[in-house]
């Protein structure tokens, strides 16, 4: 059971791992391992049959740990390398959705070193109305996601300065529903 890691989602990963371990230990021998500098040594030492990936965010959901495990020929839970990388990249995902005629909010991608206040506001006004949603392109669990008005846009963009790329998209109000899928089977829908 791999968890923790270095991402902004470390704490939620540890909570996930705690719940997973509680359930799996009833029927399986579990070794919990932090995704840290000793990860490769632990793989060698414990020779796992399968890795349950409880990592969240960078390194855990972006194809990184998956590529390590595939190179070591270790089975794991989670999507594969390419699907993980594409799912974690919000712009790549949106382009795939559009190509497959799946509706997705309109968006603008900005390099953070190229944030020009007037340019951003002009582009937003041209494409859609306020409020807008801003977020880093490669984070999950709603980390650093803001719903912005014209008044607080620049202040919130400043909070995202640590990210290389930022996504600004139209805000669509309503309920948020998550659907789990395993293979081609829908496991159920949950309102968040």
Tell where the protein language model's regions lie, with residue ranges.
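ATP-grasp fold ATP-binding core
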Residues: 97-98, 124-143, 163-177
């Amino acid at each position: 059971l791999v968890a923790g890691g270095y991402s902004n989602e470390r704490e939620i990963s540890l909570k996930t791992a705690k719940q997973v371990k509680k359930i799996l230990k009833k029927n399986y021998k579990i070794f919990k391992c932090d995704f840290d500098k000793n990860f490769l040594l632990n793989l060698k030492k414990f020779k796992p049959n399968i890795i349950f990936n409880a990592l969240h965010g960078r390194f855990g959901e972006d194809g990184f740990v998956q590529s390590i495990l595939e190179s070591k020929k270790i089975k794991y839970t989670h999507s594969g390398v390419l699907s993980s990388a594409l799912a974690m990249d919000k712009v790549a995902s949106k382009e795939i959705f559009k190509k497959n005629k799946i509706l997705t909010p309109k968006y603008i991608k900005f390099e953070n070193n190229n944030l020009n206040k007037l340019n951003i506001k002009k582009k937003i006004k041209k494409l859609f109305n306020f409020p807008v949603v801003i977020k880093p392109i490669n984070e999950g669990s709603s980390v650093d996601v803001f719903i912005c008005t014209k008044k607080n846009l620049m202040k919130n963009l400043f909070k995202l300065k640590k990210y290389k790329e930022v996504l600004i998209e139209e805000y669509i109000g309503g309920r948020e529903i998550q659907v789990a899928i395993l293979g081609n089977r829908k496991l159920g829908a949950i309102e968040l």
